[in-house]
Amino acid sequence: MNQASLSVDAITNLIEAFHHHHPAVRSAAVDELIKLGSITVNLLIAAYDDSQDQGFQAQIIQVLAQIGDAKALKLLAEVVGTSVANHCQGNVRRIAARGLGKIASTTSNTEIINNAQEKLIWALLTPEDWGLRYAAAVSLQEIATPKAKAALQQAIAQETDPVVRSRMAIALS
């Protein structure tokens, strides 16, 4: 067995551990996949696409958001824009928004920055989910482009939630 197939097998086994009944096993798998970093991204995206299990998908989004690899940009942006049927999905959207911030704040690629920023601005100005608006504000603060700051200034004027408005003020200070 060569090193590449060993790595694929190891990554696949870690991803499959998300189905384990014991939370410590799932947590350890998340930690290991994050440590492995970018080499896991394509397999994580494929596993996400192949599954209908929202809990499994949520674990994948958590890992992808923490890795912050641009290959996950499209998936994270899709998750941010997904309509929410329950509270757990809302949490996943917030994690995805933070992942977009990490990706955009750690690259110099203007196309990647603009794509992430556009989805985050939408998340800041559109959703009824205050937690998603909060996560978008934090991520736009990380990106810190003139467009991100302008969006925060626009949003703070219309924000009705005091916690989100406070976070926007911090982001603008």
UniProtKB/Swiss-Prot annotation:
Q: Name one GO molecular function term.
A: lyase activity
Q: Does the keyword Cell membrane apply?
A: no
Keywords, sorted A to Z: Antenna complex, Lyase, Phycobilisome
Question: Hey, what's the signal peptide range on this chain?
Answer: none
**SUPFAM superfamilies associated with the record:** ARM repeat
Superkingdom of this entry's organism?
Bacteria
Q: Name one GO cellular component term.
A: phycobilisome
Family designation: Belongs to the CpcE/RpcE/PecE family.
Q: What does this protein do?
A: An enzyme involved in the biosynthesis of bilin.
Write the protein's name.
Bilin biosynthesis protein PecF
Species assigned in the record: Nostoc sp. (strain PCC 7120 / SAG 25.82 / UTEX 2576)
In the UniProt record, what gene is named as encoding this protein? Answer: pecF
